[in-house]
Protein backbone atom coordinates (compact mmCIF):
# COMPACT_ATOMS: atom_id res chain seq x y z
CA UNK A 1 0.00 0.00 0.00
CA UNK A 2 1.32 3.44 -0.89
CA UNK A 3 1.52 6.20 1.70
CA UNK A 4 -0.87 9.07 1.20
CA UNK A 5 -0.03 12.76 1.23
CA UNK A 6 -2.34 15.63 1.99
CA UNK A 7 -3.33 17.29 -1.26
CA UNK A 8 -3.02 20.95 -2.08
CA UNK A 9 -5.85 22.55 -4.03
CA UNK A 10 -4.44 21.74 -7.46
CA UNK A 11 -4.21 23.92 -10.55
CA UNK A 12 -7.18 25.83 -12.01
CA UNK A 13 -9.36 23.87 -14.45
CA UNK A 14 -12.50 24.51 -16.49
CA UNK A 15 -15.57 22.45 -17.35
CA UNK A 16 -17.37 23.91 -20.39
CA UNK A 17 -20.71 22.45 -21.47
CA UNK A 18 -22.00 22.35 -25.03
CA UNK A 19 -24.70 24.92 -24.20
CA UNK A 20 -22.06 27.42 -23.03
CA UNK A 21 -22.43 26.83 -19.27
CA UNK A 22 -19.09 27.06 -17.44
CA UNK A 23 -17.99 25.52 -14.13
CA UNK A 24 -14.61 26.36 -12.57
CA UNK A 25 -12.66 23.88 -10.50
CA UNK A 26 -9.23 22.46 -9.75
CA UNK A 27 -7.25 19.53 -11.13
CA UNK A 28 -4.21 17.44 -10.16
CA UNK A 29 -3.97 15.75 -13.58
CA UNK A 30 -1.28 16.38 -16.15
CA UNK A 31 -2.23 19.23 -18.54
CA UNK A 32 -4.78 18.11 -21.13
CA UNK A 33 -8.08 19.02 -22.77
CA UNK A 34 -10.68 16.30 -23.40
CA UNK A 35 -14.23 16.18 -24.67
CA UNK A 36 -17.03 13.66 -24.21
CA UNK A 37 -20.69 13.22 -23.34
CA UNK A 38 -21.29 14.42 -19.79
CA UNK A 39 -23.34 11.98 -17.68
CA UNK A 40 -23.88 11.47 -13.95
CA UNK A 41 -23.88 8.45 -11.64
CA UNK A 42 -25.74 8.64 -8.32
CA UNK A 43 -23.91 5.78 -6.59
CA UNK A 44 -22.31 6.44 -3.20
CA UNK A 45 -19.72 3.67 -3.64
CA UNK A 46 -18.05 1.63 -6.36
CA UNK A 47 -16.17 4.38 -8.17
CA UNK A 48 -13.42 2.03 -9.38
CA UNK A 49 -15.95 -0.29 -11.04
CA UNK A 50 -17.74 2.73 -12.54
CA UNK A 51 -14.59 4.23 -14.05
CA UNK A 52 -13.47 0.91 -15.58
CA UNK A 53 -16.91 -0.02 -16.99
CA UNK A 54 -16.60 -0.06 -20.83
CA UNK A 55 -20.13 1.38 -21.12
CA UNK A 56 -18.62 4.73 -20.02
CA UNK A 57 -16.29 4.89 -23.01
CA UNK A 58 -16.07 8.44 -24.44
CA UNK A 59 -18.02 9.90 -21.51
CA UNK A 60 -17.23 12.44 -18.80
CA UNK A 61 -18.60 10.99 -15.56
CA UNK A 62 -19.97 13.18 -12.76
CA UNK A 63 -20.22 11.45 -9.38
CA UNK A 64 -22.99 12.99 -7.29
CA UNK A 65 -21.70 11.70 -3.95
CA UNK A 66 -19.55 14.56 -2.58
CA UNK A 67 -16.62 12.61 -1.09
CA UNK A 68 -14.80 10.30 -3.50
CA UNK A 69 -11.56 8.38 -3.04
CA UNK A 70 -11.62 7.47 0.65
CA UNK A 71 -11.56 3.69 0.05
CA UNK A 72 -8.68 3.86 -2.44
CA UNK A 73 -8.40 1.41 -5.34
CA UNK A 74 -7.50 -2.29 -5.47
CA UNK A 75 -6.78 -5.21 -7.80
CA UNK A 76 -10.22 -6.86 -7.45
CA UNK A 77 -12.59 -4.15 -8.64
CA UNK A 78 -11.56 -3.72 -12.26
CA UNK A 79 -14.41 -4.20 -14.76
CA UNK A 80 -12.01 -3.93 -17.71
CA UNK A 81 -8.26 -3.58 -18.13
CA UNK A 82 -8.24 0.22 -17.87
CA UNK A 83 -10.28 3.31 -17.00
CA UNK A 84 -12.84 3.71 -19.77
CA UNK A 85 -14.29 7.11 -18.81
CA UNK A 86 -12.77 10.02 -20.73
CA UNK A 87 -12.78 12.30 -17.69
CA UNK A 88 -13.90 12.38 -14.05
CA UNK A 89 -15.84 15.23 -12.39
CA UNK A 90 -15.99 15.38 -8.57
CA UNK A 91 -16.84 17.60 -5.62
CA UNK A 92 -14.08 16.48 -3.23
CA UNK A 93 -11.17 14.17 -4.11
CA UNK A 94 -9.69 12.41 -1.09
CA UNK A 95 -6.10 11.22 -1.17
CA UNK A 96 -6.46 9.70 2.30
CA UNK A 97 -7.93 6.21 2.01
CA UNK A 98 -8.64 3.24 4.24
CA UNK A 99 -9.82 -0.21 3.16
CA UNK A 100 -8.49 -3.70 3.80
CA UNK A 101 -8.12 -4.29 0.04
CA UNK A 102 -6.77 -0.85 -0.94
CA UNK A 103 -3.47 -0.74 -2.86
CA UNK A 104 -3.24 2.87 -4.03
CA UNK A 105 -5.08 6.19 -3.90
CA UNK A 106 -7.69 7.19 -6.45
CA UNK A 107 -5.51 10.07 -7.64
CA UNK A 108 -2.57 7.72 -8.22
CA UNK A 109 -4.94 5.36 -10.05
CA UNK A 110 -6.18 8.16 -12.34
CA UNK A 111 -2.64 9.35 -13.06
CA UNK A 112 -1.50 5.81 -13.82
CA UNK A 113 -4.22 5.57 -16.49
CA UNK A 114 -3.62 9.17 -17.70
CA UNK A 115 -7.24 10.20 -17.13
CA UNK A 116 -8.08 13.82 -16.39
CA UNK A 117 -10.06 14.75 -13.28
CA UNK A 118 -11.62 18.02 -12.21
CA UNK A 119 -12.73 18.55 -8.61
CA UNK A 120 -14.04 21.36 -6.42
CA UNK A 121 -17.05 21.48 -8.79
CA UNK A 122 -20.57 22.21 -7.53
CA UNK A 123 -21.77 18.77 -8.63
CA UNK A 124 -25.27 19.35 -7.23
CA UNK A 125 -25.78 22.39 -9.50
CA UNK A 126 -24.15 20.57 -12.42
CA UNK A 127 -26.40 17.49 -12.13
CA UNK A 128 -29.52 19.65 -11.81
CA UNK A 129 -28.47 21.45 -14.98
CA UNK A 130 -28.01 18.16 -16.87
CA UNK A 131 -31.27 16.76 -15.50
CA UNK A 132 -33.26 19.85 -16.46
CA UNK A 133 -31.74 20.14 -19.92
CA UNK A 134 -30.27 16.82 -21.14
CA UNK A 135 -26.97 15.01 -21.47
CA UNK A 136 -24.70 16.94 -23.79
CA UNK A 137 -21.10 17.20 -24.84
CA UNK A 138 -18.64 18.95 -22.55
CA UNK A 139 -14.95 19.83 -22.38
CA UNK A 140 -12.60 19.49 -19.41
CA UNK A 141 -9.41 21.53 -19.62
CA UNK A 142 -6.67 22.06 -17.07
CA UNK A 143 -4.51 23.67 -19.76
CA UNK A 144 -6.65 26.78 -20.37
CA UNK A 145 -8.50 28.11 -17.33
CA UNK A 146 -10.39 30.82 -19.24
CA UNK A 147 -11.45 28.43 -22.00
CA UNK A 148 -14.13 29.99 -24.21
CA UNK A 149 -16.84 28.29 -26.25
CA UNK A 150 -15.21 29.61 -29.42
CA UNK A 151 -11.90 27.97 -28.48
CA UNK A 152 -13.62 24.69 -27.60
CA UNK A 153 -15.83 24.56 -30.71
CA UNK A 154 -13.49 22.33 -32.75
CA UNK A 155 -13.03 19.97 -29.80
CA UNK A 156 -16.81 19.67 -29.33
CA UNK A 157 -17.31 19.05 -33.06
CA UNK A 158 -14.80 16.18 -32.91
CA UNK A 159 -16.57 14.82 -29.83
CA UNK A 160 -19.90 14.75 -31.68
CA UNK A 161 -18.34 12.80 -34.52
CA UNK A 162 -16.87 10.24 -32.09
CA UNK A 163 -20.11 9.93 -30.12
CA UNK A 164 -22.07 9.17 -33.31
CA UNK A 165 -19.67 6.40 -34.33
CA UNK A 166 -19.57 2.69 -33.48
CA UNK A 167 -18.23 2.76 -29.91
CA UNK A 168 -18.31 -1.04 -29.54
CA UNK A 169 -15.31 -1.18 -31.86
CA UNK A 170 -13.32 0.79 -29.25
CA UNK A 171 -13.97 -1.58 -26.34
CA UNK A 172 -14.44 -5.06 -27.83
CA UNK A 173 -11.55 -7.49 -27.53
CA UNK A 174 -8.94 -7.13 -30.26
CA UNK A 175 -8.49 -10.92 -30.25
CA UNK A 176 -10.63 -13.27 -32.31
CA UNK A 177 -11.45 -15.05 -29.05
CA UNK A 178 -10.09 -15.89 -25.60
CA UNK A 179 -11.17 -18.02 -22.64
CA UNK A 180 -12.13 -16.55 -19.26
CA UNK A 181 -10.79 -18.42 -16.22
CA UNK A 182 -11.58 -16.29 -13.13
CA UNK A 183 -14.71 -17.08 -11.05
CA UNK A 184 -16.20 -14.86 -8.36
CA UNK A 185 -13.96 -14.19 -5.38
CA UNK A 186 -15.13 -16.66 -2.70
CA UNK A 187 -13.79 -14.44 0.08
CA UNK A 188 -16.17 -11.66 -0.92
CA UNK A 189 -19.05 -14.18 -0.90
CA UNK A 190 -21.48 -11.98 -2.87
CA UNK A 191 -23.52 -14.26 -5.07
CA UNK A 192 -21.37 -17.29 -4.36
CA UNK A 193 -23.77 -19.25 -2.12
CA UNK A 194 -26.56 -19.20 -4.72
CA UNK A 195 -24.12 -20.56 -7.32
CA UNK A 196 -22.66 -23.35 -5.16
CA UNK A 197 -26.08 -24.75 -4.21
CA UNK A 198 -27.31 -24.55 -7.82
CA UNK A 199 -24.26 -26.34 -9.25
CA UNK A 200 -24.64 -29.14 -6.72
CA UNK A 201 -28.37 -29.55 -7.45
CA UNK A 202 -27.91 -29.57 -11.24
CA UNK A 203 -25.10 -32.15 -11.15
CA UNK A 204 -27.16 -34.39 -8.87
CA UNK A 205 -30.33 -34.04 -10.97
CA UNK A 206 -28.70 -34.57 -14.36
CA UNK A 207 -25.93 -36.94 -13.21
CA UNK A 208 -23.44 -34.90 -15.20
CA UNK A 209 -20.39 -32.80 -14.57
CA UNK A 210 -20.13 -31.69 -18.20
CA UNK A 211 -19.53 -27.97 -18.47
CA UNK A 212 -21.74 -25.72 -20.54
CA UNK A 213 -19.94 -23.75 -23.22
CA UNK A 214 -20.99 -20.09 -23.18
CA UNK A 215 -19.99 -17.66 -25.92
CA UNK A 216 -19.92 -13.98 -24.95
CA UNK A 217 -20.28 -11.51 -27.82
CA UNK A 218 -18.09 -8.70 -26.52
CA UNK A 219 -19.60 -5.26 -27.05
CA UNK A 220 -17.77 -4.00 -23.96
CA UNK A 221 -18.39 -6.76 -21.43
CA UNK A 222 -17.84 -6.18 -17.72
CA UNK A 223 -15.56 -8.65 -15.96
CA UNK A 224 -18.12 -9.49 -13.28
CA UNK A 225 -20.52 -10.90 -15.88
CA UNK A 226 -17.73 -13.28 -16.89
CA UNK A 227 -16.95 -14.11 -13.25
CA UNK A 228 -20.57 -15.11 -12.63
CA UNK A 229 -20.69 -17.33 -15.71
CA UNK A 230 -17.40 -18.99 -14.77
CA UNK A 231 -18.65 -19.61 -11.22
CA UNK A 232 -21.53 -21.65 -12.67
CA UNK A 233 -18.81 -24.04 -13.89
CA UNK A 234 -19.29 -22.91 -17.49
CA UNK A 235 -16.60 -22.78 -20.13
CA UNK A 236 -16.64 -19.08 -21.00
CA UNK A 237 -15.29 -17.95 -24.38
CA UNK A 238 -15.28 -14.26 -25.32
CA UNK A 239 -15.39 -13.37 -29.02
CA UNK A 240 -14.95 -10.10 -30.89
CA UNK A 241 -18.19 -8.28 -31.65
CA UNK A 242 -17.48 -8.62 -35.39
CA UNK A 243 -17.38 -12.43 -35.21
CA UNK A 244 -19.47 -14.06 -37.91
CA UNK A 245 -22.17 -16.68 -37.39
CA UNK A 246 -19.81 -19.38 -38.70
CA UNK A 247 -16.96 -18.28 -36.40
CA UNK A 248 -19.21 -18.47 -33.33
CA UNK A 249 -20.90 -21.75 -34.27
CA UNK A 250 -17.57 -23.56 -34.66
CA UNK A 251 -17.41 -23.48 -30.83
CA UNK A 252 -20.76 -25.36 -30.62
CA UNK A 253 -22.17 -22.98 -27.99
CA UNK A 254 -24.74 -24.09 -25.43
CA UNK A 255 -25.68 -20.45 -24.84
CA UNK A 256 -24.75 -16.98 -26.05
CA UNK A 257 -24.47 -13.74 -24.05
CA UNK A 258 -24.87 -10.40 -25.84
CA UNK A 259 -22.96 -8.11 -23.51
CA UNK A 260 -23.30 -4.58 -22.26
CA UNK A 261 -21.39 -1.81 -24.00
CA UNK A 262 -21.31 1.88 -24.90
CA UNK A 263 -23.19 3.96 -27.43
CA UNK A 264 -26.24 3.88 -29.64
CA UNK A 265 -27.53 0.39 -30.62
CA UNK A 266 -28.62 1.82 -33.98
CA UNK A 267 -24.94 2.29 -34.89
CA UNK A 268 -24.22 -1.46 -34.82
CA UNK A 269 -26.97 -2.90 -37.01
CA UNK A 270 -24.54 -5.46 -38.43
CA UNK A 271 -24.50 -7.09 -35.00
CA UNK A 272 -28.31 -7.28 -35.13
CA UNK A 273 -28.13 -9.21 -38.41
CA UNK A 274 -25.70 -11.76 -36.91
CA UNK A 275 -27.63 -12.16 -33.65
CA UNK A 276 -30.81 -12.87 -35.65
CA UNK A 277 -29.14 -16.01 -36.99
CA UNK A 278 -28.46 -17.27 -33.45
CA UNK A 279 -32.09 -16.57 -32.51
CA UNK A 280 -33.40 -18.56 -35.48
CA UNK A 281 -31.14 -21.44 -34.43
CA UNK A 282 -32.98 -21.33 -31.06
CA UNK A 283 -29.76 -21.09 -29.06
CA UNK A 284 -30.47 -19.79 -25.52
CA UNK A 285 -29.47 -16.11 -25.41
CA UNK A 286 -28.99 -13.65 -22.55
CA UNK A 287 -28.90 -9.92 -23.36
CA UNK A 288 -27.58 -7.40 -20.84
CA UNK A 289 -27.97 -3.62 -21.21
CA UNK A 290 -26.79 -2.88 -24.80
CA UNK A 291 -27.31 -6.60 -25.45
CA UNK A 292 -30.95 -6.17 -24.38
CA UNK A 293 -31.36 -3.38 -26.93
CA UNK A 294 -29.69 -5.46 -29.65
CA UNK A 295 -32.04 -8.41 -29.00
CA UNK A 296 -35.08 -6.13 -29.13
CA UNK A 297 -33.90 -4.61 -32.41
CA UNK A 298 -33.69 -8.14 -33.83
CA UNK A 299 -37.49 -8.10 -33.61
CA UNK A 300 -37.75 -4.64 -35.22
CA UNK A 301 -38.10 -2.77 -31.94
CA UNK A 302 -37.31 0.93 -31.88
CA UNK A 303 -34.75 2.32 -29.46
CA UNK A 304 -34.59 5.92 -28.28
CA UNK A 305 -32.21 8.16 -26.34
CA UNK A 306 -33.16 9.03 -22.76
CA UNK A 307 -32.99 12.64 -21.61
CA UNK A 308 -30.28 12.00 -19.03
CA UNK A 309 -30.03 8.20 -18.85
CA UNK A 310 -30.16 5.76 -15.95
CA UNK A 311 -26.84 5.56 -14.13
CA UNK A 312 -26.71 4.52 -10.51
CA UNK A 313 -26.88 1.66 -8.01
CA UNK A 314 -30.43 1.99 -6.68
CA UNK A 315 -32.82 1.91 -9.64
CA UNK A 316 -36.03 -0.01 -8.81
CA UNK A 317 -37.42 -2.41 -11.41
CA UNK A 318 -40.36 -4.76 -11.15
CA UNK A 319 -43.79 -5.91 -12.25
CA UNK A 320 -46.75 -7.73 -10.63
CA UNK A 321 -45.94 -6.77 -7.02
CA UNK A 322 -42.30 -7.91 -7.23
CA UNK A 323 -39.51 -5.33 -7.06
CA UNK A 324 -35.72 -5.43 -7.24
CA UNK A 325 -33.12 -2.72 -6.70
CA UNK A 326 -30.66 -2.76 -9.58
CA UNK A 327 -27.44 -1.26 -10.89
CA UNK A 328 -27.96 0.56 -14.20
CA UNK A 329 -25.82 2.35 -16.76
CA UNK A 330 -27.42 3.22 -20.09
CA UNK A 331 -28.50 6.21 -22.15
CA UNK A 332 -30.93 4.43 -24.51
CA UNK A 333 -34.12 2.42 -23.98
CA UNK A 334 -36.45 0.12 -25.96
CA UNK A 335 -39.92 1.16 -27.13
CA UNK A 336 -42.81 -1.05 -25.93
CA UNK A 337 -44.59 -1.32 -29.30
CA UNK A 338 -42.80 -4.45 -30.55
CA UNK A 339 -43.93 -6.65 -27.62
CA UNK A 340 -47.41 -7.70 -28.77
CA UNK A 341 -46.59 -8.37 -32.41
CA UNK A 342 -43.63 -10.61 -31.48
CA UNK A 343 -45.16 -12.48 -28.52
CA UNK A 344 -42.81 -11.09 -25.87
CA UNK A 345 -43.42 -10.66 -22.16
CA UNK A 346 -42.42 -7.51 -20.29
CA UNK A 347 -40.75 -9.03 -17.22
CA UNK A 348 -39.54 -5.78 -15.68
CA UNK A 349 -40.34 -2.08 -15.86
CA UNK A 350 -38.18 0.74 -14.56
CA UNK A 351 -40.26 2.00 -11.64
CA UNK A 352 -38.82 5.52 -11.87
CA UNK A 353 -39.98 6.35 -15.40
CA UNK A 354 -41.87 3.27 -16.64
CA UNK A 355 -39.42 2.34 -19.40
CA UNK A 356 -38.99 -1.29 -20.42
CA UNK A 357 -36.38 -3.04 -18.25
CA UNK A 358 -36.65 -6.76 -19.08
CA UNK A 359 -38.21 -9.11 -21.63
CA UNK A 360 -38.61 -12.79 -22.42
CA UNK A 361 -40.04 -14.59 -25.44
CA UNK A 362 -42.88 -17.09 -25.87
CA UNK A 363 -41.21 -18.64 -28.92
CA UNK A 364 -37.46 -18.45 -28.26
CA UNK A 365 -35.22 -19.40 -25.29
CA UNK A 366 -34.01 -15.87 -24.63
CA UNK A 367 -34.20 -13.28 -21.88
CA UNK A 368 -32.77 -9.79 -21.69
CA UNK A 369 -32.57 -7.00 -19.14
CA UNK A 370 -31.79 -3.30 -19.32
CA UNK A 371 -30.00 -3.39 -15.95
CA UNK A 372 -26.86 -5.12 -14.62
CA UNK A 373 -27.65 -8.36 -12.71
CA UNK A 374 -23.96 -8.76 -11.90
CA UNK A 375 -23.94 -5.51 -9.88
CA UNK A 376 -20.31 -4.49 -9.47
CA UNK A 377 -20.97 -1.98 -8.19
CA UNK A 378 -24.47 -2.32 -6.85
CA UNK A 379 -26.97 -4.61 -5.13
CA UNK A 380 -27.35 -8.36 -5.62
CA UNK A 381 -31.13 -8.53 -5.90
CA UNK A 382 -30.93 -9.68 -9.52
CA UNK A 383 -28.01 -12.10 -9.57
CA UNK A 384 -30.53 -14.97 -9.65
CA UNK A 385 -30.93 -14.11 -13.35
CA UNK A 386 -27.70 -15.98 -14.20
CA UNK A 387 -28.99 -19.04 -12.36
CA UNK A 388 -32.32 -18.81 -14.21
CA UNK A 389 -30.63 -18.48 -17.60
CA UNK A 390 -28.30 -21.43 -16.97
CA UNK A 391 -31.41 -23.42 -15.99
CA UNK A 392 -33.00 -22.44 -19.34
CA UNK A 393 -29.95 -23.83 -21.13
CA UNK A 394 -30.12 -27.17 -19.28
CA UNK A 395 -33.86 -27.34 -19.92
CA UNK A 396 -33.31 -26.58 -23.62
CA UNK A 397 -30.65 -29.30 -23.89
CA UNK A 398 -32.81 -31.93 -22.19
CA UNK A 399 -35.93 -31.25 -24.30
Curated annotation (Swiss-Prot):
Group of enzyme by EC: ligase
Enzymatic reactions: hydrogencarbonate + L-glutamine + 2 ATP + H2O = carbamoyl phosphate + L-glutamate + 2 ADP + phosphate + 2 H(+)
EC number: 6.3.5.5
Active-site positions on this chain: 289, 372, 374
Tree of life domain: Eukaryota
Primary subcellular site in the record, as a coarse category: plastid
Localization: Plastid, Chloroplast
Transmembrane segments: none
Pfam families (UniProt xref): CPSase_sm_chain, GATase
Region (CPSase): 1-209
CDD domains found in the cross-reference section: GATase1_CPSase (cd01744)
GO molecular function, one term: ATP binding
A GO term from the CC aspect: chloroplast
Domain Glutamine amidotransferase type-1, chain residue ranges per copy: 213-399
Keyword list, A-Z: Amino-acid biosynthesis, Arginine biosynthesis, ATP-binding, Chloroplast, Glutamine amidotransferase, Ligase, Nucleotide-binding, Plastid, Pyrimidine biosynthesis
GO BP terms: 'de novo' pyrimidine nucleobase biosynthetic process; 'de novo' UMP biosynthetic process; glutamine metabolic process; L-arginine biosynthetic process
Pathway the protein contributes to: Amino-acid biosynthesis; L-arginine biosynthesis; carbamoyl phosphate from bicarbonate: step 1/1; Pyrimidine metabolism; UMP biosynthesis via de novo pathway; (S)-dihydroorotate from bicarbonate: step 1/3
HAMAP family: CPSase_S_chain
Known function: Small subunit of the glutamine-dependent carbamoyl phosphate synthetase (CPSase). CPSase catalyzes the formation of carbamoyl phosphate from the ammonia moiety of glutamine, carbonate, and phosphate donated by ATP, constituting the first step of 2 biosynthetic pathways, one leading to arginine and/or urea and the other to pyrimidine nucleotides. The small subunit (glutamine amidotransferase) binds and cleaves glutamine to supply the large subunit with the substrate ammonia.
Similarity comment text for this entry: Belongs to the CarA family.
Assembly description: Composed of two chains; the small (or glutamine) chain promotes the hydrolysis of glutamine to ammonia, which is used by the large (or ammonia) chain to synthesize carbamoyl phosphate. Tetramer of heterodimers (alpha,beta)4.
PANTHER family associated with the record: CARBAMOYL-PHOSPHATE SYNTHASE SMALL CHAIN, MULTIFUNCTIONAL TRYPTOPHAN BIOSYNTHESIS PROTEIN-RELATED
Protein name: Carbamoyl phosphate synthase small chain
Naturally occurring in which organism (per UniProt): Cyanidium caldarium (Red alga)
Lineage: Eukaryota, Rhodophyta, Bangiophyceae, Cyanidiales, Cyanidiaceae
Gene it is expressed from: carA
Amino acid sequence: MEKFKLLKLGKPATLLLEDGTVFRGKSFSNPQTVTGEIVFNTGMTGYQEIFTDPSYNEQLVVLTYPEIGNTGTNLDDYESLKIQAKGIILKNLSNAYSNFRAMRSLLSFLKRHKVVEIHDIDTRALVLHIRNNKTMLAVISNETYNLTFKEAKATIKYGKHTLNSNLASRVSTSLDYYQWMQPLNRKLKFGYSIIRSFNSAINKKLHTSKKLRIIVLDLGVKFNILRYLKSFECEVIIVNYKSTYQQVMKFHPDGIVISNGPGDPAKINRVVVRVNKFINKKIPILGICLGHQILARCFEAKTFKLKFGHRGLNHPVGINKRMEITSQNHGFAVNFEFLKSNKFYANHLNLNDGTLAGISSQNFPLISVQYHPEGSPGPHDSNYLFKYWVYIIYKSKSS
